């Protein structure tokens, strides 16, 4: 084998690896998109069927089950929210911190999600949310409306985002900046309807 052949071979291998990484990323995004759309469609059909739980007898879904749909029109975001914060949950949806209340209950409902360019990119545009933007939470019984009242960045070990409150509050949090994840972006919203 001569040097010229080896250089060509190494070049072809590098191109193949680059294409593999690119196609893998595209494949992950496509799979996540269709999974999200299917989950939202099924949940909306469930709500429309009238088989949802009643306000009087609320049964909180088990870990991994659908809790609600979170909509933020100002950033064109509509995403499923499942119970729990396990890696498998956050790769395909947002996650509800089960140590906090569910939407519509008095207290602090905390929902977390990833910001990434591959898997779990549900909160990629969360940093574009502004004070007074509306956030909608669709549950099997009703839609809750919240208005953004506070936007802040905290340290990763700051657990104050989980603190209970004496009002109906929605707290969204995610890593920031994208990929570096040195801090947490926190969006706080209060129920308006």
Language model segments and positions:
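Solvent-exposed, non-transmembrane regions of membrane-associated and secreted proteins
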Residues: 8-193
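Short, Lys/Arg-rich N-terminal segment immediately upstream of the first membrane anchor
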Residues: 1-7
């Amino acid at each position: 084998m001569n040097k010229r052949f080896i250089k060509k071979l190494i070049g072809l291998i590098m191109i193949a690896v680059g294409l593999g990484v690119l196609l893998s990323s595209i494949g992950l995004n496509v799979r996540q998109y269709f999974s999200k759309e299917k989950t939202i469609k099924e949940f909306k059909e469930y709500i429309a069927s009238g088989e949802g739980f009643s306000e009087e007898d609320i049964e909180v879904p088990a870990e991994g089950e659908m809790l609600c749909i979170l909509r933020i029109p100002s950033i064109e975001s509509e995403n499923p929210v499942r119970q729990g914060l396990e890696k498998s949950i956050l790769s395909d949806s947002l996650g509800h911190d089960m140590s906090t209340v569910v939407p519509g209950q008095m207290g602090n409902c905390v929902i977390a999600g990833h910001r990434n360019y591959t898997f779990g990119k549900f909160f990629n545009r969360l940093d574009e949310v502004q004070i007074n933007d509306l956030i909608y939470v669709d549950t099997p019984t009703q839609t809750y409306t919240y208005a953004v009242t506070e936007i802040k960045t905290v340290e990763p070990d700051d657990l104050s985002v989980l603190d209970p409150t004496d009002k109906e509050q929605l707290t969204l949090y995610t890593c920031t900046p994208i990929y570096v994840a040195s801090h947490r972006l926190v969006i706080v919203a209060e129920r308006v309807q």
